[in-house]
């Protein structure tokens, strides 16, 4: 570990060519921290994410089944309404002379109200599915973010010890001293 730290310290002694150039100090560019965080996110997040997605999938499928049952009930009501419509049409034939226009108006009102009811059930089903999907996505995002933060904090706390902290401070002081000598 000391050789790795020394190699990073020696990278800091390279003279810079001006105000523009490549930053060769790997500690200053945060590549190690980013790779550790990404690795932790991938390692801890994929199992949690798959479990959450499976649970949400089951809930969404249950919601879809419930919506399909509601749809089935609406279709059943529609069939009953159609049966009543057929019955009314037979009565209309019998009473055509007296009240044809009134029966026709009742028929269309019944068809329209049944169609509106069926359309409302379809809209409710679609809104429920969309709401459940959005809620599932939000819960997964929140859960992954919490897991990532907990994993990153745990990794950082387990990796930082007093000796490493003191060596890093000493290396940074050496880099600053070398930079001061270069600028003087």
Swiss-Prot record:
Its main location: plastid. One of its GO terms (cellular component) is proton-transporting ATP synthase complex. It comes from the Eukaryota. InterPro entries: ATP_synth_b/b'su_bac/chlpt (IPR002146). Keywords: ATP synthesis, CF(0), Chloroplast, Hydrogen ion transport, Ion transport, Membrane, Plastid, Thylakoid, Transmembrane, Transmembrane helix, Transport. It is found in: Plastid, Chloroplast thylakoid membrane. It is a single-pass membrane protein. GO terms for molecular function: proton-transporting ATP synthase activity, rotational mechanism. F-type ATPases have 2 components, F(1) - the catalytic core - and F(0) - the membrane proton channel. F(1) has five subunits: alpha(3), beta(3), gamma(1), delta(1), epsilon(1). F(0) has four main subunits: a(1), b(1), b'(1) and c(10-14). The alpha and beta chains form an alternating ring which encloses part of the gamma chain. F(1) is attached to F(0) by a central stalk formed by the gamma and epsilon chains, while a peripheral stalk is formed by the delta, b and b' chains. In plastids the F-type ATPase is also known as CF(1)CF(0). F(1)F(0) ATP synthase produces ATP from ADP in the presence of a proton or sodium gradient. F-type ATPases consist of two structural domains, F(1) containing the extramembraneous catalytic core and F(0) containing the membrane proton channel, linked together by a central stalk and a peripheral stalk. During catalysis, ATP synthesis in the catalytic domain of F(1) is coupled via a rotary mechanism of the central stalk subunits to proton translocation. This is ATP synthase subunit b, chloroplastic.
